[in-house]
């Protein structure tokens, strides 16, 4: 049987071995209740020599994620879907197994670029309890792709993402500035 326990990369950076226990938006319990949720973590290399620094991380239950998606314009949802399909078709992976292993191998899902070669990247994992969902592999995405996605979304959707972030996360100013540059993914 394949190991599906959430890997350390997708766990809270401030407490080794811990799991995200509650939805950042509604505070719904995630682990014991076996609720479906998504983890997002944005990491940027800083310093000399460069060291990975977590800019922000959170878990959001699927209900809250779907509520946000429903607020996105149909135009933006369609543009993001087309973009993801195109990028997967252009990716270096030749098999489903290679796609599944890209995260484990510290490689960008779309480009195959190694984590060491990315200045900033986002980690995304869909989970239930303490395990990754078997049908949705975790992903590592080079920040360059997220910038491209930001160029695809409508002003209406961008405003909604900004409002959602402000209402639900209360980020420190340095993180809020980063979010304005399009780091909130919700794939």
What are these regions (language model features)?
Residues 17-53, 102-136:
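Short recognition patches in nucleic-acid-associated and regulatory proteins
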Residues 1-12, 39-48, 84-97, 124-125:
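Short Cys/His-rich Zn2+-coordinating modules
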Residues 88-187:
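Long, contiguous alpha-helical scaffold regions
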Residues 27, 35, 53, 63-70, ...:
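Detector for Asparagine
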Residues 6, 25, 31, 39, ...:
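Weak global preference for isoleucine
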Residues 4-9, 24, 28, 75-79, ...:
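A generic short-segment signal for beta-strand/edge and adjacent turn/coil regions
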Residues 50-81, 133-162:
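Short metal-binding segments enriched for Cys and/or His
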Residues 11, 31, 56, 66-69, ...:
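Compositionally biased amphipathic helical and low-complexity segments enriched in hydrophobic
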């Amino acid at each position: 049987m394949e190991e599906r326990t959430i890997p350390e990369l997708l766990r809270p950076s401030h407490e080794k071995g811990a799991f995200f226990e509650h939805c950042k938006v509604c505070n719904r319990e995630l682990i014991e209740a076996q609720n479906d949720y998504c983890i997002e973590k944005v990491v940027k290399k800083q310093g000399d020599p460069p060291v990975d620094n977590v800019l922000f991380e959170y878990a959001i239950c699927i209900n809250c994620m779907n509520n946000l998606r429903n607020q996105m314009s149909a135009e933006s949802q369609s543009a993001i879907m087309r973009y993801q399909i195109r990028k997967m078709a252009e990716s270096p992976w030749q098999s489903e197994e290679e796609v599944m292993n890209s995260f484990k191998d510290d490689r960008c899902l779309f480009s195959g670029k190694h984590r060491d070669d990315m200045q900033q990247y986002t980690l995304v994992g869909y989970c239930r309890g303490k395990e990754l969902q078997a049908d949705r592999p975790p992903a590592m995405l080079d920040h360059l792709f997220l910038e491209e996605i930001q160029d695809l979304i409508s002003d209406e959707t961008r405003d909604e993402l900004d409002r959602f972030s402000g209402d639900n996360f209360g980020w420190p100013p340095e993180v809020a500035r980063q979010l304005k540059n399009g780091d909130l993914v919700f794939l």
